[in-house]
């Protein structure tokens, strides 16, 4: 279990993202007291570079994204990443996605990605962020038609949504260009 030991945790809100990536990397759950304390913090004064460093570690070293990103959801930090938050409210057709909604599907995909990393940091960064962003268009395109859940055009719609998300994390134009078509 990951747990803050003093209230100094609040002096640098980046520690919330650090807990996210440590949780995903090491397989530790975050203690409920730390989750509650994290809810009181904001990332508004954290530079993009520092934010990106923690997301980069998550993508390159995370093994259990359900733990890491699940912590982000539990401490309500998905409010800073509405593109991800919306995935949790978007159902999918259970015939094609028995694992559940788009959020759950994305976490499963990230866990699968973690098992096949290539060893090339750049390639893993591109693929990892592509996996994270691959269904961001579904919340804006999902419809129920003839009792089936469909998301026509979600890939195309997701490009600008993913671009906005990535631009808030990093100014690495080459990375964004390679992640997005």
Regions found by a protein language model. Give the residues of each.
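Glycine- and charge-enriched loop/helix tracts that form the active or gating conduit
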Residues: 1-132, 136-153, 157-174
